[in-house]
Amino acid sequence: MAKTLKGLRASTFVDKTFATGSGYTIENKKKAIALPYNKALKKWVRLTLPSTGLSTVVQVLDVGPYLWWDEEFILKGKRPMAEWFYENDCAFPSVTDGHKRWGDISFAGKVPTSRASVDLTPPVWWDLGVDKTENELRSFSVDDMIMEWFVPEPIILEQEEDDEMPDWLKL
């Protein structure tokens, strides 16, 4: 059964390398979301942006922001760990605790700079109706994203190149 959480902070990422391989480039315009749990990789989520009323389904191709073990968020639907550290002005620990490898993150011992709990590539924002350039999106975020996870992979039907009605549909 899919989980839904409202009021997520979503920000933009344009990493050239994802945990799953090659990342986003201006040329490939790869659609992806990063979630803070490595076992979410290759799964699908539905995002809805209330301000535009649009939704899209996108694959998890990277981990983050900040963490890759936030199972309370992803598996149990609790608020993201990064939100708590940000809102309480609390630094991330810098000591490894089992699979929580605090010492391995670049923000170890620092307060997160944002409460972002998901990162999106620019084409995902465009699918959600955000009319900003790639450069403008680099500093763009919203606080009202709705995410439903995990959902079935979308079925994408190939479109006729000339957009004419196929013969088999004509009366």
Briefly describe each language-model feature range.
Residues 1-169:
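Secreted/periplasmic proteins
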